[in-house]
Amino acid sequence: MVIRRKMNKMIRKGMIGAVMLGAAVAISGGVATAGYIQGTHVKTDLPGPFHITMSPDGSTLFISNQSGHSVTFVDARTQKVTGEVAVRVQPEASAVTPDGAFLYVCNAESDSVSVVDIQRKQEIKEIKVGDWPSGIKISPDGKTAYVACSGCMWNAIDVIDTGRMEKVRSIYTSDYGPRMVEISPDGKTLVAILDTVGSINRSVDFIDIASGRVVENRVIHESSNLRDVVYTPDGKYIAVTHQTPKNWLPVCEAENGQVFTNNVTIIETKAGGKVARLPLDDLNNYDGNPYGMAMDPKGKYLYIGVRGMHRVTILDMDKVLGLVRSSTQEELDYLRDDLGLVRDYLVARVPTGLGPSSVCLSPDGKFCYAANYFSNNVTVIRTAVD
């Protein structure tokens, strides 16, 4: 409520607004009690920017162009395109090695991972993996890459030895469709979101990295279209973006009347911990689609690209986790469809380009970048981090 009152006060004073600058939009406004948000657009002129990540030193952005079958390099300081590398068909998620030397890119339709030499701006190897690789993370020591293969009848995470640049084994999940993966801050656990086609209760696997075995599967009841997963910095919680269908039909198509809400689910990572499905927006007709996320380094804010609403939604994680900690599982289940909750943890909804499908943060957390799939550009957001 305090945040909402402050935002309303700023709106009345004219401190939040939007100015059309040709094809670009400039937006400024307030976040909580410090800093501001300002959106500008970097034009890439390449079709379908689907995923965005950043070099460890914060100097370069890497944008996977799903329809252009390429990766665009952008200088983060000047916001200018510095290069483009051709990869394989339909690149999606990518990950940079900790030393900043190589970029590993999932080529969904080619069933492969491209290894890009960042300094040379060149693909140096293609590694064949399972069906439809869509998510990838690299271990903190840089020695291993984990690739989520989300084909509808596929249940494997392929493991790549980055020194040899080849697939060495597969880790099998408890159900089909691992879409994205994330590694715990201590490097011991791999979490995979399972977007199993046809299931109304999609789930998350917690995998022991040392043994490669699933140690627990946690169900998100009445969930669909799981998109992304991130850990809190302390490793005690994960956040998962997804939609929740409100009336299931034999043919699950929006034009036949299926209505969704947009959700983020917070899962306590300890065995048997709480699962809190929290709303982001009002009911909609399949146009919300919360996608990629980024957690700021201190765990204060969560940034969510809401692809169908063309904005980044920012949540106050202290308030979100305060709600989870102070409530029983029964209470959380009762509150999960209460849209009134949103005002308690919502910080801001920042307009972007069209269809932000992926977001990333600078290493210091001062800038958020959103890849806008339908407008072929990147929105740069100044955050509230001092």
From Swiss-Prot:
GO terms for cellular component: anammoxosome. Induction: Is among the most highly expressed proteins in the proteome. Pathway: Nitrogen metabolism. SUPFAM superfamilies: Nitrous oxide reductase, N-terminal domain (SSF50974). Its main location: other. Residues 1-34 form the signal peptide. InterPro entries: Host-pathogen_enzymatic-act (IPR051200), N2O_reductase_N (IPR011045), WD40/YVTN_repeat-like_dom_sf (IPR015943), YNCE-like_beta-prop (IPR048433), YVTN_b-propeller_repeat (IPR011964). It is found in: Anammoxosome. Keywords: Signal. The keyword Signal applies. Component of the hydrazine synthase complex that catalyzes the condensation of nitric oxide (NO) with ammonium to form hydrazine. The beta subunit may play a role in modulating transport of the hydroxylamine intermediate through a tunnel between the gamma and alpha subunit's active site. NCBIfam families: beta_rpt_yvtn (TIGR02276). Part of the hydrazine synthase complex that forms an elongated dimer of heterotrimers composed of one alpha, one beta and one gamma subunit. This is Hydrazine synthase subunit beta. It comes from Kuenenia stuttgartiensis.
